[in-house]
């Protein structure tokens, strides 16, 4: 038996985690937090409800609903299509340049977002323990492979102004607190015209933080363990 449970990736059975919590097991991050993050439509709605800047989006139950919206000229191309669940690292995401690009889309729940002409993609990894102690790693810049849409290079620290860096760190902290997330939270962001829009979040160690193994006094993996055990958080420099 175990007393404390965490997970490697968010695409797991959240109902099973909730049952374990009801049996008295501690799950970090909690099933309540995971339910919000696991579904991209719920995640985006959470951003809106908590005044977190993000791109405009629409939710669709299936491909027919999307096509009806396109026929009614309610979708502006180009745009970004995302599955609401089980998409990550470039999977379940597609740029739609015209209505023709919907032909081979899976018939599933989805969101369609405005395409943001961003200058940089940023990430902040933040840790929070049950006592409420919070620490961020440095804001980093991510460069993606054009074919796989996966992170290929991470630049640390990000080449951004002090003002933008402060905004990025503050938004990551606000999200961690608002989600009541215990453990790591990776916050992906778009930088556009010196303003930040939140793309999405992941409640786990993240590709943008692997450099912390060699570059920081405390790695993201160590920090996750420290946070869920309610230990004092480590030095992130």
Label every model-predicted segment.
Residues 148-159, 200-213:
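Short, flexible active-site loops
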């Amino acid at each position: 038996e175990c007393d404390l449970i965490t997970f490697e990736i968010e695409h797991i059975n959240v109902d099973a985690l909730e049952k374990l919590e009801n049996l008295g097991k501690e799950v970090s991050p909690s099933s309540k937090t995971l339910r919000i993050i696991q579904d991209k439509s719920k995640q985006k709605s959470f951003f809106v409800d908590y005044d977190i800047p993000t791109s405009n989006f629409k939710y669709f139950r299936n491909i027919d609903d999307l096509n009806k919206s396109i026929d009614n000229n309610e979708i502006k191309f180009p745009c970004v299509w995302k599955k609401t669940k089980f998409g990550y690292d470039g999977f379940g995401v597609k740029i739609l340049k015209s209505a023709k690009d919907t032909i081979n889309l899976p018939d599933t729940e989805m969101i369609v977002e405005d395409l943001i002409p961003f200058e940089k993609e940023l990430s902040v990894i933040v840790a929070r323990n049950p006592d409420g102690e919070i620490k961020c790693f440095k804001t980093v810049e991510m460069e993606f492979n054009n074919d796989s849409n996966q992170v290929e290079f991470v630049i640390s620290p990000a080449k951004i102004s002090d003002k933008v860096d402060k905004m990025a760190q503050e938004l990551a902290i606000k999200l961690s607190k608002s989600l009541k997330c215990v453990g790591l939270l990776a916050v992906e962001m778009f930088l556009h015209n010196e303003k930040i829009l939140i793309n999405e979040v992941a409640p786990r160690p993240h590709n943008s933080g692997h450099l912390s193994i060699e570059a920081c006094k405390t790695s993201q993996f160590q920090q996750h363990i420290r946070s869920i055990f309610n230990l004092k958080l480590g030095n992130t420099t």
